[in-house]
Amino acid sequence: MMITLRKLPLAVAVAAGVMSAQALAVDFHGYARSGIGWTGSGGEQQCFKATGAQSKYRLGNECETYAELKLGQELWKEGDKSFYFDTNVAYSVNQEDDWESTSPAFREANIQGKNLIDWLPGSTLWAGKRFYQRHDVHMIDFYYWDISGPGAGLENVDLGFGKLSLAATRNSESGGSYTFSSDDTKKYAAKTANDVFDIRLAGLETNPGGVLELGVDYGRANPQDDYRLEDGASKDGWMWTGEHTQSIWGGFNKFVVQYATDAMTSWNSGHSQGTSIDNNGSMIRVLDHGAMDFNDDWGLMYVAMYQDVDLDSKNGSTWYTVGVRPMYKWTPIMSTQLEIGYDNVKSQRTSENNNQYKITLAQQWQAGNSVWSRPAIRIFATYAKWDENWGYSNTSGLQTKDSSGSGAFTSSRGDDSEVTFGAQMEVWW
């Protein structure tokens, strides 16, 4: 008994040491941006985005405080097998006051188990809410392949010539399905689930420094028992993606081709909206973008994209965008950036065009001499010029020609220009 009692303090000390080591192993990652800006004509900073475009050129053109705070920890490891718990909470406010309250968005909460299946070495089994293998263009904050949400999957299965990933995720639409509470009275669901099933094959070597990734996504509305979709609802749809990545000049170039149908044409990124009656049709996208650090003096980001959404409802659009962001590095921690971007969006219904030019000059101090170096503090001046001839009706949501020149009856902004200036910080870790 005395021996047991003498061993107890030692056991407690060892356990405390283990718990302390585990506590110190918590990983803290995230992203944040915030700042202050003014508009030349008066008031707080305005931001500029062409009506009908899905994104905007972001340098000197972000008007909110936004943050993602990630906490994660490896909870168990034995040999090459492990379990990792990952979370992410996101916030966004208008950066107008000292005290701004908001409801946080719980973006991620998942477990990733590595090498759990002996006959699939290197694979990861996962379940929960997750940012799943997202593909984006940083300089316009545009996610062109993103099925994130609650889900489960098996990824990075080594086939010898490439890696296979399988996943299922879910998002919901407000309303969208109904049942009958009596013979002639419809009762609508608060939300209708949409499921997406994703297959990807990555790491296909095509040429020196070049790899190919192929993927297919099938999305469908999944109404609850005894509920039905509206007549004409798209119900389901497909999206196919091919992406070639080339390592070049200290960075990369990505060339992407995507084609989507019906329920997958609403977001054009991999999310499904099968309850909609307005998205039957197709989408084709051709995209080229990249980021490079040529040497200690020069870096560059760029994007060029064509996207055509052809809908049976005639509410589609054709969107062209092209932009560059060269960076001159005065010292390893100070640089000047110039971002020039152009958007042109043609309405399928009216055949009218909206276009916008946006130019930003920024002086930046950053933690390193790469285009990706962060944290960064920048001061900027932005000029935007737009000419918009159509918008979405304030009543019907349909595309409508704007003859007022002021956007009085639609989301169109008319013909105008503006200057803004300010300061911003951006960080990821």
Swiss-Prot record:
Give the principal location in a single coarse category.
membrane
Q: Which Gene3D superfamilies match?
A: Porin, LamB type (2.40.170.10)
Please give the subunit comment from the record: Homotrimer formed of three 18-stranded antiparallel beta-barrels, containing three independent channels.
Q: How does it sit in the membrane?
A: Multi-pass membrane protein
> Which signals induce this protein?
By maltose.
What is this protein's function?
A: Involved in the transport of maltose and maltodextrins.
Keyword list, A-Z = Cell outer membrane, Ion transport, Membrane, Porin, Signal, Sugar transport, Transmembrane, Transmembrane beta strand, Transport
Organism whose genome encodes this protein: Klebsiella pneumoniae subsp. pneumoniae (strain ATCC 700721 / MGH 78578)
Q: Where is the composition biased (Polar residues)?
A: 397-412
Q: Does the keyword Ion transport apply?
A: yes
Reactions catalysed, as given in the entry: beta-maltose(in) = beta-maltose(out)
Q: Where is this region: Disordered?
A: 397-416
Biological process GO terms, please?
monoatomic ion transport
GO molecular-function term, one example from the UniProt record: maltodextrin transmembrane transporter activity
At the top level of its lineage, which domain of life is listed? Bacteria
Site note Important in sugar transport applies to Y143
Q: What positions belong to coiled-coil segments?
A: none
Which SUPFAM superfamilies does this chain map to? Porins (SSF56935)
Record's family?
A: Belongs to the porin LamB (TC 1.B.3) family.
The answer to whether keyword Iron applies is no
Q: Name the chain's protein.
A: Maltoporin 2
Where does it sit, as one GO cellular component term? pore complex
Record's signal peptide? 1-25
Which lineage do the record's taxonomy fields give for this organism?
A: Bacteria, Pseudomonadati, Pseudomonadota, Gammaproteobacteria, Enterobacterales
Question: InterPro entries from the entry?
Answer: G_neg_Bact_CarbUptk_Porin, Maltoporin, Porin_LamB, Porin_LamB_sf
Marked site (Greasy slide, important in sugar transport) residue numbers: Y31, Y66, W99, F252, W372, W428
Q: What Pfam family does this protein match (any one)?
A: LamB
